[in-house]
């Protein structure tokens, strides 16, 4: 009986890892994290006003994207900080590195 190598399952594991990653990130991105306002019949997640004979609800909606961002417009925005840092890294990386011996860029 000839010896045969065991089957290679790396493609199966790679496909499972990619599928699980896509499912995880899709669930993470599409998750609703807005505060729930209203009752079972009247839900106002993006703001609004509802009034009937016995109750009234007025909700102005969220003013910021998440709990990390501040309430003001441009003081501290995490995405703006990331963009500025990436631009700074790219700009500093493009500076020519000159040779200390001859002064030229190699």
Curated annotation (Swiss-Prot):
Keyword Transmembrane helix among UniProt keywords: yes
Residue ranges that the UniProt entry lists as topological domain Lumenal: 30-73
GO biological process, one term: transport of virus in host, cell to cell
Record localization: Host endoplasmic reticulum membrane
Ranges that cross the membrane: 9-29, 74-94
Pfam (any one): Plant_vir_prot
Alphabetic keyword roster: Host endoplasmic reticulum, Host membrane, Membrane, Transmembrane, Transmembrane helix, Transport, Viral movement protein
Segments on the Cytoplasmic face: 1-8, 95-106
Coiled coil: none
One of the record's GO cellular component terms: host cell endoplasmic reticulum membrane
Keyword Transmembrane helix (UniProt): yes
Cited function: Plays a role in viral cell-to-cell propagation, by facilitating genome transport to neighboring plant cells through plasmosdesmata,.
Additional observations: TGBp1, TGBp2 and TGBp3 seem to act together for cell-to-cell propagation. TGBp1 is the main movement protein that physically cross the plasmodesma with the viral genome. TGBp2 and TGBp3 would facilitate TGBp1 function.
Protein family (similarity comment): Belongs to the Tymovirales TGBp2 protein family.
Name the record gives this protein: Movement protein TGB2
Species of the source: Lily symptomless virus (LSV)
């Amino acid at each position: 009986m000839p010896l045969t190598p065991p089957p290679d399952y790396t493609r199966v594991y790679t496909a499972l890892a990619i599928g699980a990653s896509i499912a995880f990130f899709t669930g993470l991105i599409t998750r609703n994290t807005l505060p729930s306002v209203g009752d079972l019949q009247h839900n106002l997640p993006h703001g609004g006003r509802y009034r009937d004979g016995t109750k009234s609800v007025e909700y102005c909606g969220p003013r910021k994207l998440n709990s990390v961002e501040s309430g003001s417009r441009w003081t501290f925005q995490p995405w703006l900080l990331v963009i500025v840092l990436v631009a700074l890294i790219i700009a500093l990386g493009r500076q020519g590195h000159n040779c200390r011996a001859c002064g030229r860029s190699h």
